[in-house]
Amino acid sequence: MKKMSVLGIGPVYVISCLIITILSIYISEKDFLNSGKVYELKDFMVLVGAVCIALGIVLWIKAVISQKMVKAIKNNKLLTTGVYSIVRNPVYSAFYFVLTGLLLIEANLWLLILPILFWIYMTVLLKLTEEKWLLDTFGEEYIKYCSKVNRVFPWFPKK
């Protein structure tokens, strides 16, 4: 059985979303999207954005470093404990939260369309690539895991 790449489809997702995020913030800073700027909510959006970024960093550290994700992938092991018990794709979630946080800090409502598009893009990429591989590799164990744990948004496991 072919092993999954340690990076998976991650670089495609992260690099493309990062480029879009940077360009969007640049465009907003150049006053092309002024109608979406909400100056009266700036402090609140900066706070929420900072929380999202912090959550993303914690998720990444927990998934990659604490749970030795690279070793598990190399050993064809399905991670279902620790941070993986509350979200199936904590590394993707981490980048999603960091990018969303950066967009929130800009305090421009037009930019808040992007996290929705990023979520759709991530869902499609995962379903077409990594989730197929995981299903082929782990079968019923992966199906049960999917029924209990969210793909992207951390939450308490379903019973």
What are the functions of these language-model segments?
Residues R88-F97:
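Short hydrophobic alpha-helical membrane-embedded segments
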Residues M1-T80, Y96-K159:
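Membrane-anchoring alpha-helices and their flanking helix-loop junctions
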Residues L79-N89:
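Short, amphipathic, aromatic/basic-enriched membrane-interface segments that mark the entry/exit
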